[in-house]
């Protein structure tokens, strides 16, 4: 179980590096993450097989010779991601490609979080429309939700804005959406977004 968790974390980190630094070689990924070249190669091969990552141009060989590195990049067309965010005064849902480019969206301004059941009902209906507009559920690789509050291991521990306490919102949404769902606090995901765009890559935590 522990090895599976380590591999999953490495997979996530490798995807993040490729997204932020593409085009990037396997060696560069290994050096940036301090993960063994063998582990990087194994995970990258799986990502290529799944269609999430593709190989592109060749780099220059080192001065000592040897094989030229092959650069990696995210395949934007490999799938879609459903994203949603709740903030203090508004909320939005959108469909993005794997590089975060927004394709379709809905926004909700000036609403009260006191009406969460009604809001979730509205979001559910609009989400179904967006999924259909994007070509169907089979095109999606997953969904991500950003919320204010305390989130741990994909579980909402406390969100006063949403009126949630120790809530397994992930399970509820996965059943509703029929796709993997990732939930985290808004502050963390904002920082992660900057990381992916390269603005904060040299900073950790």
Question: What is each residue range found by the language model?
Answer:
Residues 29, 40-53:
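Basic amphipathic alpha-helical segments that dock to polyanions
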Residues 35-46, 63-65:
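Canonical helix-turn-helix DNA-binding module
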Residues 66-105:
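Gly/Thr-rich phosphate-binding beta-strand-loop-beta motif of the actin/hexokinase/Hsp70
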Residues 25, 54-55:
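Short beta-strand(s) of the beta-wing in winged-helix/HTH DNA-binding folds
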Residues 1-26, 31:
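Extreme N-terminal segment that seeds HTH/winged-HTH DNA-binding domains in transcriptional regulators
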Residues 29, 105, 112-205:
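Glycine-rich phosphate-binding loop and adjoining helix at the ATP-binding site
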